[in-house]
Amino acid sequence: MSEPNFIIFLTDDQGYGDLSCMGCADFRTPRIDRMARDGARFTDWYSNSPVSSPSRAALLTGRYPGNAGVRSILAGHRTASGLPRSTPTLATQLKQLDYQTYMTGKWHLGLAESSRPHQHGFDRWYGFMAGCIDYYSHIFYWGMNNPGPGINPTHDLWEDGVEQWQDGEYFTEMITAKALAYLRDAAKEDRPFFLYVPYNAPHYPMHAPRAYMDRFADLPWDRQVMAAMLAAVDDSVGAILDEVERLGLADNTCSFFMADNGPSRETRNWL
């Protein structure tokens, strides 16, 4: 067997019980449930941190957050430092084994040039680098009530270090579209690949397309929008795994799904 391909799906602030395979009773996540049914389901899996940046640093480095150099939530301004360039990551190590490496989604490990995805082993990357963005304008609004030079709101959407403008498009679907494009590119090469897909959902702001909201019209609004956001992720995971199958890569691809750090009690929303 040739070297396996790897796909890591990550959700943001998703609760333990927000998937039907983990006990959710008021909505279903059939494609993620299928992963659990056909693979291994971990019922006692612990994040290395209760917040975003340290948990992501631990995932990508295999180190405790403090040893990885990321001990707290990182800032969102464009010169914010983050994961030290000297810290090895899964992407840097796989590149040494001639893997293609791709990321599409949320980074949150620094915006400074030395801390961006391409400095940490990713050949191609797409997404945003701060902690959260509006799902349609792709602007980081945190701190908007206290603006100042270099502070927020800040547009935060990039591809390979070049700022992108796709106003009005839903970010979950944008992540998925880029993942599908990366898969097709990867399949053309006679080399294995690593695809990292860190979704921003269901992190606030609580935004979902009307078509997804309409699926859950019987639920209270707060639960309705949570269900809608996770349904979009579930459909996206399914689309990516279907593409892996279509490309004839399924038998040699290991896919893994997890949440970053559990749910948030915050109530911020930007409309």
Segment roles from a protein language model:
Residues 1-271:
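Formylglycine-dependent sulfatase
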